[in-house]
Amino acid sequence: MASPAVATRRPSPTFLVSGPHHRLRRHEYSPSKLGSPSSASRLKVTALFGWIKGDRVARTRELIPSAESYTLTGSASEVDMKPREVSISVVSSIMDIPPAEWDACAVDSAEPEKLNPFLTHAFLSSLEESGSAVKETGWLPLHVVARDENGDIVGVVPLYLKSHSRGEFVFDQSWAEAYHSYGLEYYPKLQSCVPFTPVTGQRILLRDTSYRDQVFDALVKALKNLATKLNVSSLHITFPSEGEFGNLKDRGLLQRIGLQYHWRNRNYKSFDDFLMDLKQPKRKNIRQERKKIPAQNLKMKRLRGDEIKSSHWDTFYKFYRNTTDNHWGRAYLTREFFHLLGEKMGDKVMLIVAEHDDKLVAGALNLIGGDTLYGRLWGCLPDVHFPNLHFEACYYQAIEAAIELNLSRVEAGAQGEHKIQRGYLPVTTYSCHYFLEPGFATAIGNFLVHETAQVKHVINVLRDSGPYKEDIMKEFAPQLDNEM
């Protein structure tokens, strides 16, 4: 879970490597390779974010290209596969897609342990319905849909036309500055992601069919074609799965890596079991931090489903706004979003709250996946200061909950090297990028080669400083190495 203090403290070494402070230098690209900016052709698309009057729905439909047909053929090992036709189209709202059909692609019924709640229709529609991820906030939905000959949906891609780089957690502001310095427009751009959510997961969502690999290929081609038709600068697929990361490289997208901090469950039966895997000084420190919670007359509760009332969401929204107003400077999520989340996904939501004298003073929002607890947001009342409460609510309570629910891991969000000493180890995250300007594609590709080496070095250094005993780290090593 990202610490709100990141915005006001000295940037961490990791942030300097992968964040907006790391610049693409002018000598790394040549204007002679770029050509002149086609400002006239871009102007119409850019204006989408400046609508003032008129029928917005009609104008959105003008933007959306007509459906395209793709013929699917088998690979070399599938020579007997009958050619199939799929039609790929774009919709301006996820509400145009039946929830059951979207989720048939996003949720693998054969492997429920892989459920990613952020990819469900319920979560994404809550973002749109609440006015959080919509055209007015710079997130114009352009979701891509693949249908078979019978009109059944066999694949979808959550996609947005964006007028900025906020709420993404993969920093490309220096790329935008480089475009601007040569008179080119970086925005709008296409972004496949879960808005405001740095969680790894599938981005090309496929129904379980015998020809899903071919649908994947068709959808990637359609994404590239859409970028060309809209005449945007680029296409970005952020926080894809590791498998998609490799497949998208094979299809011409540039690769970028970052890092997060995750906790892993070694079949622990209790929090004390987990502590016994740590070096003695780290174990002692955590116990001391946890003792300070009851000593400050704080009571922790983990609420789920119907236990979370409307009043809880109103209070948590105050916590959230206190965090954004004092640290981030922008509230991406509306009050209505939290209420919709509770209504649509109550069984997948865990709200960890702290009470002081029977009054809610702080809270942490988590979502429950098939095998993972996802820590998302943290906040407290203004002027509230209880030492170690952030660590308790965001990290230790999450670990306890994961052990109780028999979940394999806790993903505690972006940034925060302080998580390492509390049992969260650095893991690799992924993103893929496609640029229509060949000169910039080459320059950014070269930049990413050097950045990747730096990020891998940082991950190795951070792992060496981990809190676990040496034999435990040896057990973790194969998994961690595979993720690099």
Regions from the PLM with identified roles:
Residues A2-M484:
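N-acyltransferase acceptor-side catalytic subdomain
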